[in-house]
A protein has these predicted regions:
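Generic structural hydrophobic/aromatic packing signal, biased to beta-strands
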Residues: 34-36, 53, 112
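Short, compact, well-ordered microdomains
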Residues: 75-119
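OB-fold ssDNA-binding interfaces and closely related basic DNA-contact patches used
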Residues: 1-42
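Compositionally biased, intrinsically disordered low-complexity regions enriched in proline and serine
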Residues: 5, 11, 23, 49, ...
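Hydrophobic transmembrane signal anchors and adjacent membrane-proximal interface regions, especially
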Residues: 3-6, 15, 68-71, 95-96, ...
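Compositionally biased, intrinsically disordered low-complexity regions
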Residues: 13, 51, 62, 100, ...
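Acidic, aromatic-enriched beta-alpha/helix-loop junctions
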Residues: 38-88, 92
Length: 119
């Protein structure tokens, strides 16, 4: 498991990469779960997002299943801040932003490719 720390004006964000094995998915035996969390003492138990991607040894990490990453970062007045999405864009991830949830407190975006070595 690898952890990357991102400092933002709204706190410290952690991007955690975990390997997993899904026996029910023989076509995808070595997926990675990408979990984003914010280290914020006001929300110590919040998990901010999970996306499963396929590991391709030739092309890197690819989302071949259409899974979506759901990321929330708390800012002023509890609003969500796209700091992690900006960091993912810088890392080379293909990120679509701007799709707000019905409650107006978040964004859902597809993660097509993620290059953690560039963070």
């Amino acid at each position: 498991m690898r952890t990357y720390t991102i400092e933002s004006p709204y706190g410290t964000l952690r991007l955690v990469l975990q390997t997993a094995s899904y026996a029910a998915m023989p076509h995808n035996p070595r997926p990675l779960a990408i979990v984003a969390r914010e280290e914020n003492p006001e929300y110590p138990d919040e998990t901010y997002g999970v996306v499963t991607v396929n590991m391709d040894p030739h092309t890197g990490l690819k989302d071949q299943t259409g899974d979506r990453a759901f990321v929330k970062t708390y800012g002023e007045n509890g609003h969500w801040v796209p700091e992690l999405m900006r960091q993912l864009e810088k890392s080379g991830a293909a990120v679509r932003t701007g799709r707000s949830l019905e409650n107006g407190r978040g964004v859902i975006f597809p993660l097509y490719e993620f290059k953690p070595e560039l963070l």
